[in-house]
Amino acid sequence: MKGKFIVLEGLEGAGKTTALHTVVEQLRSLGITDLVFTREPGGTPLAEKLRQLIKHETEEPVTDKAELLMLYAARIQLVENVIKPALAAGKWVIGDRHDLSSQAYQGGGRGLDRHFMQTLKDSVLGGFEPDFTLYLDIEPAEGLARARGRGELDRIEQAGLDFFNRTRTRYLELVRDNPKAVVINARQNIERVTADIQSAVKKFVESQHG
């Protein structure tokens, strides 16, 4: 079987880290063990430096478009230098965020023009996209409360509840129209969330054998 690219998406506090472990365990139980893990922004030396600029306060205000362009610079470095080579080698790539995050956070939360967003995506990524996306859906207030419980919030996490409400609305619009995406209700108890993720991953893997 060819390598596949699976991405976990969601707001802060949605439980992506726990979900990633569930995805990995389920894939391994199905005999898929040659895995590569990525995170966005980040995943290459240059992309990790950009991550620091994006997520932490700088000496000058970061404009919304500058933020977006840094995200795409980090993303294309990761796609070309890590993800595509891994897929070509038959490995499965598990990503903590990908382009849907930019469409939701910068397109929805920041309110950047959607035509501009789509043009940039097409120019940078071409037709490259995940084979399967799991979107962990949670109420923004609950997610932010969980994130605060982990410690200090980064620059983007400090954006405020209205920002995250807009981000979630855009996420839901995007996954509703994406046949390669599944919504997981992350407000359920951990056992139910785990079972839903296991079921979705199993169904996806089985579909690849068809």
Swiss-Prot record:
InterPro entries xrefs: P-loop_NTPase (IPR027417), Thymidylate_kin-like_dom (IPR039430), Thymidylate_kin_CS (IPR018095), Thymidylate_kinase (IPR018094)
Recorded catalytic activity of this chain's protein: dTMP + ATP = dTDP + ADP
EC number: 2.7.4.9
Signal peptide: none
GO cellular component: cytosol
Binding residues annotated for ATP, in chain numbering: 10-17
Coiled-coil positions: none
One GO term (biological process): dTDP biosynthetic process
One Pfam family here: Thymidylate_kin
PROSITE patterns from the UniProt entry: THYMIDYLATE_KINASE
A GO term for molecular function: dTMP kinase activity
Keywords for this protein: ATP-binding, Kinase, Nucleotide biosynthesis, Nucleotide-binding, Transferase
NCBIfam families listed in its UniProt record: DTMP_kinase (TIGR00041)
Family designation: Belongs to the thymidylate kinase family.
Role noted for this protein: Phosphorylation of dTMP to form dTDP in both de novo and salvage pathways of dTTP synthesis.
Name recorded for this polypeptide: Thymidylate kinase
Organism this protein belongs to: Actinobacillus succinogenes (strain ATCC 55618 / DSM 22257 / CCUG 43843 / 130Z)
